[in-house]
Amino acid sequence: MELLKKRILEDGNVFGEDVLKVDSFLNHQIDVKLLNEIGKEFKRRFENKEITKILTIEASGIGIACIAAQYFNVPVVFAKKHQGSNMDENTYESEVFSFTKNKSYKVRVSKKYINTEDKVLIIDDFLANGNAACGLIDIVREANGEVQGVGIVIEKGFQNGRKTIENKGVTVESLAIVESMKNGKVIFKN
């Protein structure tokens, strides 16, 4: 997605060779016009799939998933990272490791919101090692739902996330694939 790549080059910040900070437009301050275009692009890429729900993980994926859901006309479910007092105790759970936070945590989805009839599109902001997406795939499969694909805004193509997800038999569509971030410069895969 050229508009997204252009924005990453203009406003993204590289730290080391593996951290890309896009908080000025994607995951802290949100450019809603850009997110609308991202939502349309996800719809275009998955238009041949039957989607009944979009699943993401709190917090950065929620805004992206909600905008995309408008184009699919389906609800969004997000996996919670914390068992709050208002969280249903009857949940599907999966352990995921966060590359960003460098720690593991359990994510949960109420059994009320994912079931055997669901055909789920998983959406997230970043794909690095694939742990978050794989955790969500496991939750959908535990519910006997069907994963229709994984939509990623920015993929770190130099990490193994895509391969990990594809090894589970799931298609990945990334809107921008970063091939490398050497010398503070983002290079995209063609």
Curated annotation (Swiss-Prot):
Keywords: Cytoplasm, Glycosyltransferase, Purine salvage, Transferase. The keyword Nucleotide-binding does not apply. It catalyses: XMP + diphosphate = xanthine + 5-phospho-alpha-D-ribose 1-diphosphate. One of its GO terms (molecular function) is xanthine phosphoribosyltransferase activity. Pathway: Purine metabolism; XMP biosynthesis via salvage pathway; XMP from xanthine: step 1/1. 5-phospho-alpha-D-ribose 1-diphosphate binds at residues 128-132. Its EC number is 2.4.2.22. GO terms for biological process: purine ribonucleoside salvage; xanthine metabolic process; XMP salvage. It is found in: Cytoplasm. It comes from the Bacteria. Belongs to the purine/pyrimidine phosphoribosyltransferase family. Xpt subfamily. HAMAP family: XPRTase (MF_01184). PANTHER family: HYPOXANTHINE/GUANINE PHOSPHORIBOSYLTRANSFERASE, XANTHINE PHOSPHORIBOSYLTRANSFERASE. This is Xanthine phosphoribosyltransferase. It comes from Clostridium novyi (strain NT). The lineage of its organism: Bacteria, Bacillati, Bacillota, Clostridia, Eubacteriales.
